[in-house]
């Protein structure tokens, strides 16, 4: 096996498939990474800025060239702005994942989401009490609707803090309070991060980074935590499972379907579909012995925890899974 592939992956099957990809002239993530070398030195140090149309600007890290952007931002401000915007993008991604699940929960409550149901009524009631909702005498669907509405309020701008922040240790919350970084609303903090980091707004790098921390907390104790709780309510609480992993989970005699993504809303229905007698019969009619559903990356992990499904690999293995030629979907 070519020595170069040892630098790409520790797995033998991954190395074999990298060689196959090269022979088949299939471009992979490693090829694209190599083509990007050498990376821009200004970008690697965070000293380039494209936040307004007066740029792009860059600051010389050795003090020999420009030390400020056109707007007057120095190295500290540019680095802080760039980091804050990266945090805002990540917080928006995770938190929107949570919003999708809350919207599904609301549709379940309203009877507008066939195929979905409340799998963990106990968890539903437990989380509802954290939102100060009365649970006694209410059926699951009524309570689910109320909880979805309450969670949507956490995305807004009218609250003093996101609800589930109360789970954090009191001493830790006191530190955040003193620093002034208690997140007030999930969308609010992301929007403000984009506002603060624009040209001519916040020109104090300490202030920018403090808000970046607040934005991160709005995700960790807001959007991401909501996503976790609603996933458990709708799809069941994950349990320790025995499973298998790596490319070898693909099966030659079956229809191989790979789920890959960030949100379990679709993947859970794929699990149900792969167990449907009609589709199993169709697979057999086409000459397969059945359907083999495997996971890659985040959604694959969710299915492994809830259903024991095998994992074909992480997100860097996505293209190599396809290089096998054994994947139908």
Regions found by a protein language model. Name each.
Residues 2-329:
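Metallocofactor- and cofactor-centric catalytic cores in central/energy metabolism, strongly enriched
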